[in-house]
Design a protein with these regions (language model features):
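Acidic, serine/proline-rich low-complexity intrinsically disordered regions
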Residues: 6-221
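Ferredoxin-type iron-sulfur electron-transfer modules and their immediate structural context
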Residues: 1-2
């Protein structure tokens, strides 16, 4: 049995013009059926999520199969994305590491990570799959929509309507994986949770269509 009424879900999708199911994200100790990246570093986890979006395939990660260290960190499997991350995001280390120049100084980069510590993974696997594949008994912790501006405007408006506030959506400066999982999980613990607008990560953007952004929120929203 589905988590929701099929008729209501159909009406919701048709009204908003959704072309794809949002993804639900949850943790479990039961190994799911689906695809996972090769062991170790094998590329950005965001690219693998295209399989869940486009093909309806369950995608899962664990401490040994994570795609990229940053993704493992934001999913709560690693305590740090990589050594000297503050230099990697800023000015680099001459002769040793090229800096990405996303943050002005190493000091500011350290502050960035001090303010944003991901929740430790509560189970072995972090699973992403289309919401319309969930059955009663398993609920996602986070739901993330991948959508163009016209559909996002509808979701944006509906989120404010549902939460009865005018500040219910915000867009933090974070990585793509941070905005679809880490921050929505943080919002879940708040008395007044927000939805998180994302996919402004210039490193992740080449893996997605030019007109696609994300809106992620705790399932309770």
């Amino acid at each position: 049995m589905k988590l929701y009424s099929e008729e209501l879900w159909k009406q919701f999708r048709e009204t908003l013009g959704l072309k794809e199911s949002p993804l639900g994200i949850y943790y479990t100790n039961d190994k799911p059926e689906g695809i996972t990246p090769a062991e170790g570093i094998s590329g950005c986890m965001m690219g693998l999520l295209q399989n869940a979006r486009k093909k309806g395939t369950t995608v899962y990660f664990d401490k040994g199969h994570f795609g990229c260290p940053g993704g493992a960190y934001y999913m709560g499997f690693f305590e740090s994305p990589r050594p000297n991350i503050e230099y990697f995001l800023s000015c680099g280390i001459p002769g040793e590491m090229e800096g990405e120049r996303y943050i002005k100084t190493p000091e500011r980069a350290r502050e960035y990570f001090t303010r944003m510590i991901p929740r430790r993974a509560p189970a072995t696997y972090c699973v992403f799959k289309p919401v319309d594949q969930f059955q009663k008994g398993t609920k996602p912790e986070v739901v993330v929509f991948f959508a163009p501006p016209d559909i996002l405007s509808g979701l944006f408006t509906l989120t404010h309507y549902a939460l009865e506030r005018t500040d219910a959506v915000y867009a933090p400066f974070r990585s793509g994986c941070g905005t679809i999982l880490t921050y929505p999980l943080k919002e879940a613990g708040k008395e007044q949770p927000h939805a998180v607008l994302g996919m402004f990560d210039v490193s992740a953007r080449p893996m997605f269509e030019k007109d696609i952004l994300t809106l992620a929120m705790p399932y309770s929203v």
